[in-house]
């Protein structure tokens, strides 16, 4: 690994994912390498179908690669056992998706609390962490509102609070502003960047939004699953 990235918490080397075989083989991503340090924002840029979501699923251990390696801290994610992946998703990696993924019958606080319930944290700790998480995204006072009572930007803030309600080393966000207007999307990304810096989280965001790209420490541009020079449209 290059000397410049020895302190990276998230690394990928030669990461490849194919679907099917032979003439029917489809490239999800091909030979992608990257590294993200604590407190850094890396943007994966590309048009629809470029392979952004495939790459993020591999980085977060949601899918297994065809070839290559992913490491988060000391864990070889591609070779991890199911138990190790459960621990990874419970304690280390937080996910934020374009669709928010909130349960409509639960309040904002109850949605944020879900990962803590799954981890069997005690009630006092859950209350404290949920209150702190909602306050960190500017939603204190909205604890008892359900998703249908919140704006799109507020719902995405709840999703971010849920992803970070437990201390996380890595945050992976797939088109987090895709369903938001430009002003609200910018506010959400300002929040993500602030939390990335303040908490020392290694954050990876997939997007083609130029406002988000402008905030990045590093940009990886994908086309047909392969890394291209940034700005290369050929």
Regions found by a protein language model. Give the residues of each.
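Conserved ABC transporter NBD signature motif
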Residues: 68-76
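Conserved ABC ATPase signature
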Residues: 146-150, 154-156
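Short coil-to-helix segment of the ABC ATPase nucleotide-binding domain corresponding to the Q-loop/switch region
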Residues: 106-114
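ABC ATPase NBD coupling module
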Residues: 23-26, 77-94
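Conserved ABC ATPase "signature" region
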Residues: 75-76, 124-141
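ABC ATPase C-loop
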Residues: 139, 143, 163-164
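Helix-to-loop junction immediately C-terminal to a conserved catalytic motif
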Residues: 60
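A short, proline-enriched helix->beta-strand linker immediately N-terminal to the Walker B motif
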Residues: 165-169
